[in-house]
Structures are given as structure tokens and as C-alpha cells.
Amino acid sequence: MGWLTRIVCLFWGVLLTARANYQNGKNNVPRLKLSYKEMLESNNVITFNGLANSSSYHTFLLDEERSRLYVGAKDHIFSFDLVNIKDFQKIVWPVSYTRRDECKWAGKDILKECANFIKVLKAYNQTHLYACGTGAFHPICTYIEIGHHPEDNIFKLENSHFENGRGKSPYDPKLLTASLLIDGELYSGTAADFMGRDFAIFRTLGHHHPIRTEQHDSRWLNDPKFISAHLISESDNPEDDKVYFFFRENAIDGEHSGKATHARIGQICKNDFGGHRSLVNKWTTFLKARLICSVPGPNGIDTHFDELQDVFLMNFKDPKNPVVYGVFTTSSNIFKGSAVCMYSMSDVRRVFLGPYAHRDGPNYQWVPYQGRVPYPRPGTCPSKTFGGFDSTKDLPDDVITFARSHPAMYNPVFPMNNRPIVIKTDVNYQFTQIVVDRVDAEDGQYDVMFIGTDVGTVLKVVSIPKETWYDLEEVLLEEMTVFREPTAISAMELSTKQQQLYIGSTAGVAQLPLHRCDIYGKACAECCLARDPYCAWDGSACSRYFPTAKRRTRRQDIRNGDPLTHCSDLHHDNHHGHSPEERIIYGVENSSTFLECSPKSQRALVYWQFQRRNEERKEEIRVDDHIIRTDQGLLLRSLQQKDSGNYLCHAVEHGFIQTLLKVTLEVIDTEHLEELLHKDDDGDGSKTKEMSNSMTPSQKVWYRDFMQLINHPNLNTMDEFCEQVWKRDRKQRRQRPGHTPGNSNKWKHLQENKKGRNRRTHEFERAPRSV
């Protein structure tokens, strides 16, 4: 019974080690890592590799009702079928030769800049889209007819109605823009000049006069990079609706020592029409606040992620209080990292109702404004809810004056839990895009994040509460490569109706399903360990989880991922595909061999056991100079007869132990190998010794070299060994007698005889092909 006790202790030790690895941040590693080839082979990705004369598939518009994805690119607008993006329509919208030549004469790149890059693509009404492009540094806009119904199959450009795109689309295709079309009015954050210096938030189209932010005032906007724009209701009264812009900009003078970038959220009232005597045709309700995304550090020194890259609003039950997800990266060139922070709109509104930023004191630093704030409070929308003013043109002069000089709030907006929910550092990529799906699971609702990177991969991450629903744990489920070549992901859309994810980049468009339950495995434990809210064990396979379906055999544990509790009553026999793979490997004595075993899950802890021939006892393999352990398996050096036996590869994850592989290693001694090599074609080994004695010198040379090669215990001297063989060969060639004209005729007949013998014995002297 002693050996049984030792095995039990060994298993408990492995379990404790596995749990320790989890506590040390093992969840930060993707459980599954799928290459582009694996995604293709498993039919989990569909790619549109773009057209030869187009690129920059960055502008997305998702239409769930028509089951279409509209994409703006270079000189083209596409309409993709949501079921399969291989089915698409296209509109060609290039610039004229005159515009292109003018752009070229202005010193711009004719291929990368002097084209019509689509920057704005919005739904205008039930039958038309509104599109704007850079127009080779001459912005232009028009309408696209899509018909009343999806079956109309209409997708064409309104060639008779082109508009000036200034204040709607940037001139430079490299500049970011954010836009929103509401009730026939276009809200845009963009640059309004050729040089890309006059940045503003505009409202154009519609029946009202265009309106914008204050010009040439860094307190309002300081070289911003616009990310996105969203309409969010403040109350049940539509007059209180506000448009929020997310952007990053240079820090205001005095706000930070040295040059720095800050992430911002800006607000404007939808019913803002500018002032009467001051701020005419300018926003009177514009306010902005800083978005903080940082990791708390010792002594109050935080690590900040200030480069806002993307924003996603998760609307659920209350449209007035969506959850804001923001993707951030670091500004430092030394420390590169990415993070996802989550914000509540109640915190945002609290900041906009807080103190204004004001410069005062001997050092003229930014301090909270302590004076009297005029009524109605600047930033409040004119409505019956919060005042009694019918229009911003009726606001008192002191309100307009205060709003003009105090556009920034003093307090920043901190993320929920005061820290990011996802952090990635020390990796070869940074986050660029994010979309989020709220999924119903057996034990609650979970937000599943799909995060795009600058190398063309998508991370699937779920936030799981630990002790409470506010203390979240980051679990990285999958890392998927969706493009053949590394390229930055610049656009993402998620279709809950089709359960598909759509991704855009410079190279093309990709489509992949939100869930791939079958890839997790064919056992209940494997499905439970995945902790994927989309998937559950249905009694026979890991399949899509539907909350409405009632099955007693359904097994799912997202919060803990504990297969020992949920799958302990299930016995997985061979027909469930749970039996380990078996292999037989032959190795040569004194040589090296490699036993390959890598689990599907990158979070699993792998350990090996060895079982000698005709023995039941198994012992754990210890790593030493003889056995080297790698992520891919075991390397056994200088094999001996005692190494023959069974090698068992086990994977431990979250307390669950699974045998992945059983390798039977047969070590062949050198004498036996010599007999095998010298057997004749008839399989008669009795002539082995006679054949060895009759070998020519050249045969013995290659045989000696071969045996020395396979028997050489030190792999590091392989180059030295080859060098010795080459030196000997060169030395033998130099020692051959030279041919002189005087004795050439004398030895001519001997040379001819030698040629004949060489022809007859050539095949015999060649090394066997099996070698």
C-alpha cells in the first residue's frame, strides 16, 4: 500500500501546484490560441481579402434589419451579406482626374492620400445612407439609395446630389473622425482645414445653421483625435438628450508637467443652437472631462493608460445608463501596455455636475472654481426639466461668458472599481478595438468582450465576479488570428441576431462566429473548464447554451469553472473521445529522442509519469541533465535501455486531471541497429558478419560516420563532428596522385578498367536510402 499512498500524495501535490499557478495570474494567458490556418481549417473565419484597387476598410455601418454590413473604403463602398461576407455588392466612388492631379501637385502621396477615403457612413432615413469621403483633400458627401425593403436589392450612388464635405469629413485620410446622424442632423468631430489644424465638433445638415466649438482656443480642444460619438438620454424628456464625444488630446498647459495625452469625454446638448450675442453659432453647452484608466501603485503613483483607442456602449435595460467600455494604451515608448476600463454614466454625470477647472494663484495652476456659478448652470440643456429656458439663445450673458471660459471640469471620471478590468503588458501587441456582448448563462449574465489588436488578432475575454459582482476577474478565453498577415484591426461590429463578429483592417474584412463550442473538447470537464458563457455540456457534446431550453443534463459553471463538482457523476468512456492517445516511438541507444505532448489549453499544467515494463507502479519524471522539459514535451538525451517503458502525459487544470497521451518508448541498442542496417533484402541475417568483413574502405567510412553520428551523446558537438568528416574528405582528395602528361598513356587502360568497375559497384557503395 506504500506505493498507493505515494501516488495519492503526488496527485495532491500536482493539484496544489496547479492552483498556485492560477493564483499567480494564469488566467491572463489565453486558454486557446488559434492560428489563421486553424481558423480556416475549422471553418471559423470567412475573409474578404479586398480589391486590388482598394484598401482601408475602416468605416462600418451595421444594419441588422436588412442583414447587411456597409463598409467604406478607398474609392469604394461595399454592402456585405451578414450571413456570408463573400456575398457583397459594391459602389465605385473615385475622385476625378483633376482632383487627383491637384492633390498630387500639393505634395501629397497619389496612392495613399490622393483618393476618396470614405470616413462617414450613416443611415439617413429608411431608403438612403449618407456618405462622406476625403475626396483627395477636397471632402465630398452624397446619398446612397438602398431601397425600402431588403428584397429590393438596391445599392447605388446618387450621382446628381453631391455636397461639400467640409466640417463632416477630414481632408487627410490619416486623421480620425467621429460622427453621428440624428434626425437629419450630422454631428462630427473632425478637422475642418487642409492643414489639419482646425479641429472642431460640428453640427451640419438639417434646417438649422451649422454650429461648432470655439475656434483657436486650446481650452476647448487641443489637437484632438476623435474616437466616437453617442446619443444618451438624460431623462424621459427628449429635450434633455445629450451627444457625448470621446476623444484624446494634448493636455492643457499647466495641467501636466511636460507634454502628455489625456483621454476625454465631451458633452453637448442636442437642442443647443448657440448664443445670441456671444458664442454665436458656437456650442454653449460644451463641457469636457478627463477619463482616467490607471492601475493604482504604491505611494499614490499610478500607472496610466492615456491613449484612448476605442469606446463601446453596452445598452441593456436602461438606455439612460449604458455601461461605457474604453480601450486604452500607454503613451510611453518604453513601457507598452493596453487596458480596458469600464465607466458608469452616473459617475460621468456626477463629474459634469461637479466643480469647473479654473486657473488661479501665483503659479496660474488649475484649481477647482470656488466662485459663484451663474444660473442656469452652464452645460444644462434648455428644457422644462432643469430650468425654464426654451433655447440657448435665451440664456443670460453671464452664463454664456462663464461657459466660454470654463469648458473643462476639474474632477476626472474614474473607472468602476478604480482600476481596469483587462490589462495586457509585456506582449507584442496593443489593443485597438472593442465590442461587447451580454450573454445569459446558467449562473447569471456576463459581458463577453471581443478585443482587436494591432497585429490582426482578436481576444475573447469575459469578466467574472469574484466575491461580489463589482470585484471582477479577467478570464481570457481565446486568442484568434483572423488575417493571413499581421495587420491592425481598425473596425469591429457585432451582430447579436446573426451571432457573428465582423472585423475591418487595411487589408480586408473578416467574419467569425461569436462561439466555437465544439473546439473545447468532447468531454463534460473540458466544456466546463472553458468557462465560456456561450457554451454548456448538453449530455453528449459541448454546444451552444440557450437559457430557454430546459435539460437536466446541462452542465455549465462560468463563475468557478469547476468540473469536479459539475461533471463528477459522468463517466467518459472511449466513445466520448476521452481515452488518451497512444503512440509507439523507437529510439537508438546513446542518441536523443523527443516525446511531444502539448495540451489544447494553455492554462493547463503538464506533468509526466514513467512506468517501467511489466510494472504497475508509476513515478513522476524528474527533470535533470538527462531529461529536459519544454512547453512542447520531453527531450530525452543519451538514451539507455532503462529508459524503455511507458510515458504518460497528464494535464491539470482547475483541479481536474486528464491523461492526454501514452507513449511507449522502445530503446534499440547499437548492436541490434547494426544488424538491422546490414540485413540483405531477403531478410537473412546470417550473412551480416560476412558482409561486414567484405565491406570496401569507402563503405566502412560512411558506416563509421553514421554510427558515430547516432551514438554521439553530446548534441552540442554536432558541428565539430561534421567539420571533422569534411576535413578528412578534403585531406584524402589532396593525397590522391596527380596526373602528368608523360604517364597519361601508360595508365590509360587502367583508368578505363577503373571506370568500368566504378559503374558496376556504384550502387553497392552508396549508403542505404533508409539511413
From Swiss-Prot:
Which residues are the signal sequence here? 1-20
Q: Where is this region: Disordered?
A: 728-771
Cystine bridges: which residues?
A: C103-C114, C132-C141, C269-C381, C293-C341, C517-C535, C649-C722
Q: What is the effect of changing P396S?
A: Found in a renal cell carcinoma sample; somatic mutation
Q: Which UniProt keywords apply?
A: Developmental protein, Differentiation, Disease variant, Disulfide bond, Glycoprotein, Hypogonadotropic hypogonadism, Immunoglobulin domain, Kallmann syndrome, Neurogenesis, Secreted, Signal
Associated condition reads:
Hypogonadotropic hypogonadism 16 with or without anosmia: A disorder characterized by absent or incomplete sexual maturation by the age of 18 years, in conjunction with low levels of circulating gonadotropins and testosterone and no other abnormalities of the hypothalamic-pituitary axis. In some cases, it is associated with non-reproductive phenotypes, such as anosmia, cleft palate, and sensorineural hearing loss. Anosmia or hyposmia is related to the absence or hypoplasia of the olfactory bulbs and tracts.
Q: What is this protein called?
A: Semaphorin-3A
